[in-house]
């Protein structure tokens, strides 16, 4: 689980910075630099490491995925795919927690 979190975060941050360096992302984003939103989405996904409820972690993964795709676009898809795998893992964990109770 922690490996998926770090892989997702590093993929998001790396692809956003690489897209900026290669000139795929320019400064024409209305709010600011689009690459920064991709980096922010990668950092948000690291919040999952904080001990909290599984439902909160699912919301964080969803927010990270949506924010990354809106900010960076198609460059964020590898990280978004990893976030989807992470969300499936969290969903299984939530179901196991419900069966234990």
UniProtKB/Swiss-Prot annotation:
Organism: Bacillus subtilis (strain 168)
Membrane among keywords: yes
Keyword entries, A-Z: Cell membrane, Membrane, Transmembrane, Transmembrane helix
Main location: membrane
Membrane topology reported for the UniProt record: Multi-pass membrane protein
Domain of life: Bacteria
Protein name as it appears in the record: Putative membrane protein YozS
A Gene Ontology cellular-component term: plasma membrane
Residue ranges crossing the lipid bilayer per the database entry: 4-24, 30-50, 66-86
Name of the coding gene: yozS
């Amino acid at each position: 689980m922690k490996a998926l979190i770090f892989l997702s975060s590093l993929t998001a941050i790396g692809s956003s910075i690489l897209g900026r360096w290669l000139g795929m992302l320019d400064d024409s984003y209305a709010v600011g630099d689009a690459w920064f939103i991709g980096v922010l989405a990668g950092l948000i996904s690291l919040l999952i490491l904080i001990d909290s409820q599984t439902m909160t972690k699912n919301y964080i993964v969803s927010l990270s995925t949506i924010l990354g795709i809106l900010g960076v676009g198609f460059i964020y898809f590898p990280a978004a795919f990893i976030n989807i795998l992470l969300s499936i893992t969290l969903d299984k964990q939530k179901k196991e927690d419900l069966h234990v109770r």
